[in-house]
Curated annotation (Swiss-Prot):
Name the record gives this protein: Ethanolamine ammonia-lyase small subunit
A GO cellular component entry from the record: ethanolamine degradation polyhedral organelle
GO terms of biological process kind: amino acid metabolic process; ethanolamine catabolic process
Function: Catalyzes the deamination of various vicinal amino-alcohols to oxo compounds. Allows this organism to utilize ethanolamine as the sole source of nitrogen and carbon in the presence of external vitamin B12.
Protein residues bound to adenosylcob(III)alamin: V161, E182, C211
Lineage: Bacteria, Pseudomonadati, Pseudomonadota, Gammaproteobacteria, Pseudomonadales
Keywords noted in UniProt: Bacterial microcompartment, Cobalamin, Cobalt, Lyase
Subcellular location: Bacterial microcompartment
Keyword Lyase: yes
Length: 270
């Protein structure tokens, strides 16, 4: 009996080291090899699990406290995960008691803040639990140089992107940034997205926001995401706008710790 695999390799197989995407899987007859088929099913299960994984805002709040930061635990108007998935509109608004809590905070502390940071589970609590604190570490160490005042960080359960608009408006913030779990993909169940808005208020559309996507070690690094976000924030303050009228033209010079990067595979480098 031959030890030779019945699977036929793909000539592009060397490219797989450059991407987690499903390329050059080979074939077994007219179908996929068994290993590739099982890996696909496993990745699909991971993506489904990421959507339904419970959010743990208290753990994030503890992490913020260890960093000397305040965290407010809030909930959207979606009462549970099933409602959240079926009624996106409810995930965009806070529960009335949570909105009242933010109004009271604003009345007690007076005046607005330059920046309100929101962390929400979105469609992948896994992404938030893995990447929110490391990303905040990179971002917050750069903020003092800008001289911006910071509102308490809001931790929102069952939140959608637009919930940051209401939070920013209630806190009187000039800018909002929401860190939220993106819809899981088959090679990325834990991608974190950042959405930035200048002059937030209820009723804004996606055209008023800037998005930085796929923040995770296997995608856009924390340092590069913070670098791009700070550029957008500076330009927004200067031009007093955000969204489609504000383009990401940040310098992309290599950051410390970014590594040497892959070479040109066509030339046999890297």
């Amino acid at each position: 009996m031959s030890d030779r695999s019945p699977a036929t390799e793909n000539p592009w197989q060397q490219l797989r080291r450059l991407t987690p995407a499903r390329i050059a899987l080979g074939r077994a007859g007219a179908s996929l090899p068994t290993a590739a088929h099982l890996a696909f099913q496993f990745a699909h299960a991971q993506a489904r699990d990421a959507v339904h994984l419970p959010f743990e805002p208290a753990a994030l709040q503890d992490g913020l406290r260890r960093r000397g930061l305040d965290g407010l635990l809030l909930r959207s108007a979606a009462r549970d995960r099933d409602t959240y998935l079926q009624r996106p509109d409810l995930g965009r608004r806070l529960r009335p008691e949570c909105a009242t809590r933010l109004r009271d905070w604003h009345a007690e502390h007076g005046g607005g803040r330059d920046l309100a940071i929101v962390v929400a589970d979105g469609l992948s609590a896994l992404a938030v639990q893995r990447h929110a604190l490391p990303l905040l570490d990179c971002l917050l160490e750069r903020l003092p140089a800008e001289g911006w005042s910071l509102a308490p960080i809001s931790l929102v359960e069952q939140g959608r992107v637009a919930v940051a608009d209401e939070i920013g408006e209630l806190l009187g913030a000039r800018m909002t940034v929401i860190l939220i779990g993106e819809r899981p993909g088959l090679s990325s169940p834990d991608s974190l997205g950042l959405y930035f808005t200048f002059a937030p208020r209820v009723g804004l559309t996606d055209a008023a926001r800037n998005c930085i996507s796929n923040v995770r070690p296997e995608g856009l690094s924390y340092a590069m995401a913070a670098h791009k976000l700070l550029y957008l924030m500076r330009e927004a303050c200067r031009r007093r706008l955000s969204g489609v009228e504000l383009k990401d033209e940040a310098e992309v010079a290599r950051l410390d710790g970014a590594g040497s990067g892959p070479g040109n595979f066509l030339l046999g480098e890297g």
